[in-house]
A protein has these predicted regions:
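Conserved pre-ATP/AMP-binding loop-to-beta segment of ANL
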Residues: 32-33, 155-173, 180, 203-209
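AMP-binding/adenylate-forming catalytic core of the ANL superfamily
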Residues: 103, 110, 120, 364-369, ...
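Conserved AMP-binding A3 loop
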Residues: 46-48, 169-193
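Gly/Ser/Thr-rich phosphate-binding loop
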Residues: 231, 248, 253-261, 270-330, ...
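Conserved AMP-binding/adenylate-forming
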Residues: 41-43, 58-106, 422
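N-lobe entry segment of adenylate-forming
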Residues: 1-45, 49-64, 68, 92, ...
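Conserved AMP-binding/adenylation subdomain of ANL enzymes
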Residues: 93, 192-209, 217-257, 272
Length: 526
């Protein structure tokens, strides 16, 4: 291929053209035969393959009566189908509502209700469960089995809707740390800016290979990684589900140069016995939440990874902080991505700036119009609560050093992070409170075994009626009906009384300090 061929999306510097539909059509027109996605244990797609298949899906949706502005909810784990429905929804100007396929019960019901979609497109393996949930609760929603939806016809490219910079094109649900999970409404510019952050801060080019093993129903997998590849011509290597045992082999086999990982993945990799093949790969960039100093050192020295880039962000605010190439992270988040964002540490009660070196709340706002969420779907009160005094309040505690580096300290909100997922303590508690003999519940994080980088385990303290004899296995099984697999507690504790504030709020900080006590029951089935 001619060395002068330009693979980077031509309008990357012009926000007016930050639209997924336009990106796909331009890239498929200029580079139709470039192999852009490889599904491990599956097919390989060119830009043209991607476009044609997405236009076929768009025709299916059009035949079902979808029109610009409608919401379409998908409950799909298969990355091939997920990607095609995502692009098809962009082609028609729809609002793509992506649900985490691990959720179930009341949490799933809440998310389907709030999305206000006429149809939920469900992967075959989940169809019976979701269909039953919808019918049982008399929702005015139709569930469609994705396996039964096919079309040889496609809409014409002239029918593709590009939309505007400000159009909401995606909804992803994030943990409701003090209430139900919230649907983050994401405009075109916000989605594309995730990808631009990766391109600019990772120096991503067409000759690179990006390994994606994180779920596409999160912004990390779909926008930071996949969309960044689509905009640059870098090849996306997709494993449908993370496999700890296959991670290193995949990195070597597919000549991976870039990847994003979670803390738990990093902890697994560095815990493997040293091997003479540890540097036998082409991996040059790892993007991750800040790693402790020792795992980062091991990646750099033992595995020879040139850049281990820390970053800080969330679905609502994009990635406003990146580590710098050729710089040791040392557990820090990096510096502000000043081209597009402002970040300050402020007093969480007074909303005023505080001095460098002091702990306060991390607050963010965009410089790029619509480079942020537009709000929480159906929850205007929550939008106002987090976005006040012209700053988004992340609920995270942090420090800004005089050098301009930011340090993440802890979560102000009662959010638990496990297996790469943010878990709402509220939703875990509600799953137990539905059990008739449970009177009070408090879910909180306990450090996982394995040291730094292993994230959290879920612990739930419970109060029960005095005359009840507890069988912990039955208790877990009852709660599981309304819990995602990653939300199932490892530890349960029955208490006679909770520590509480004067206003009656459970003091979870005291429960966390007590940790795993002698009267704690451990779930050995997770």
């Amino acid at each position: 291929m001619n060395e002068k061929t330009q693979f980077l999306y031509s309008n990357i510097k012009d926000p007016i053209h930050w639209r997924v539909s336009e990106i796909i059509l331009e890239q498929s027109s200029k580079h139709p035969n470039l192999k852009i996605i490889k599904f491990i244990d599956g097919p390989e797609w060119t830009y043209n393959d991607l476009k044609i298949r997405a236009l076929q899906k768009a025709n299916i949706l059009k035949q079902k009566g979808f029109k610009k502005g409608d919401a379409i909810t998908v409950f799909i784990q298969d990355p091939k189908e997920f990607i095609l429905y995502w692009i098809a929804s962009n082609f028609l100007g729809l609002l793509f509502v992506a649900l985490n396929t691990a959720i179930k019960g009341n949490v799933l019901l809440h998310q389907i209700k709030i999305s206000k979609s006429k149809y939920v497109i469900v992967e075959d393996i989940f169809f019976e469960e979701v269909h039953e949930l919808i019918n049982k609760n008399n929702l005015d929603v139709f569930s469609l089995n994705s396996k039964e939806l096919s079309s040889e016809h496609l809409i014409g490219e002239s029918q593709v809707d590009f939309g505007k910079l400000s159009d909401d094109v995606c909804v992803m649900f994030t943990s409701g740390t003090s209430g139900p999970s919230k649907g983050v409404m994401m405009p075109n510019a916000h989605c594309v800016l995730f990808a631009i952050g990766t391109i600019e801060n990772y120096n991503l080019k067409q000759h690179h290979n990006f390994y994606i093993s994180l779920p596409l129903f999160h912004a990390n997998g779909l926008f930071m990684q996949l969309l960044a590849c689509l905009m640059t011509g870098a090849k996306a290597i997709i494993r449908s589900k993370f496999s700890a045992s296959k991670w290193l082999d995949d990195i070597r086999k597919y000549e991976i140069t870039h990847t994003n990982m979670l803390g738990a993945i990093a902890a697994f990799v560095v815990s493997q016995p040293p091997s003479k093949h540890d540097k036998d790969h082409q991996l040059i960039v790892i993007g991750s939440a800040p790693l402790p100093s020792e795992p980062e050192r091991i990646f750099r020295e033992r595995f020879g990874v040139k850049d281990v880039l820390p970053l800080y962000g969330m679905t609502e605010v994009n990635i406003p902080i990146y580590g710098l190439k050729n710089e040791i992270g040392g557990g820090k988040c990096g510096k502000v991505y000043e081209k597009y964002f402002e970040v300050e540490i402020r007093d969480p009660d007074k909303d005023i700036p505080i001095e460098d070196g002091m702990v306060g709340e991390i607050m963010v706002r965009p410089k790029q119009p619509f480079g942020f969420m537009s709000g929480y779907m159906g929850m205007p009160d929550k939008t106002i609560e987090t976005w006040r005094n012209f700053w988004f309040h992340t609920g995270d505690a942090g420090i800004r050093e005089s050098s301009g580096h930011f340090i993440f300290v802890d979560r102000i909100k009662d959010c638990i992070r496990r297996r790469g997922e943010n878990i709402s303590s509220y939703e875990v508690e509600q799953a137990f409170l539905e059990i008739p003999y449970i009177t009070e519940a408090a879910a909180y994080a306990i450090p996982a075994d394995g040291g730094d980088g292993m994230e959290d385990e879920v612990m739930v303290a419970l109060m029960i009626h005095d005359d009840i004899t507890i069988n912990f296995e039955n208790l877990i099984n009852s709660a599981k009906n309304n819990l995602a697999k990653f939300s199932i507690p490892k530890y349960l504790r029955i208490m006679k009384e909770f520590p509480k504030t004067q206003t009656g709020k459970i003091q979870k900080n005291k429960l966390r300090e007590e940790g795993v006590t002698v009267d704690t029951w451990q779930n050995n089935n997770i």
